[in-house]
Swiss-Prot record:
This is Photosystem II reaction center protein I. PSII is composed of 1 copy each of membrane proteins PsbA, PsbB, PsbC, PsbD, PsbE, PsbF, PsbH, PsbI, PsbJ, PsbK, PsbL, PsbM, PsbT, PsbX, PsbY, PsbZ, Psb30/Ycf12, at least 3 peripheral proteins of the oxygen-evolving complex and a large number of cofactors. It forms dimeric complexes. The keyword Chloroplast applies. It is found in: Plastid, Chloroplast thylakoid membrane.
Length: 35
């Protein structure tokens, strides 16, 4: 049970980090002329 909970938390954290990283990477990617 504890292992399953740790696995779930790891997957959730991984997806959240991926979403945040992708959002931050795409933000300046849409405006390459600003910088």
């Amino acid at each position: 049970m504890l292992t399953l909970k740790i696995f779930v938390y790891t997957v959730v954290t991984f997806f959240v980090s991926l979403f945040i990283f992708g959002f931050l990477s795409n933000d300046p990617g849409r405006n390459p002329n600003q910088r």
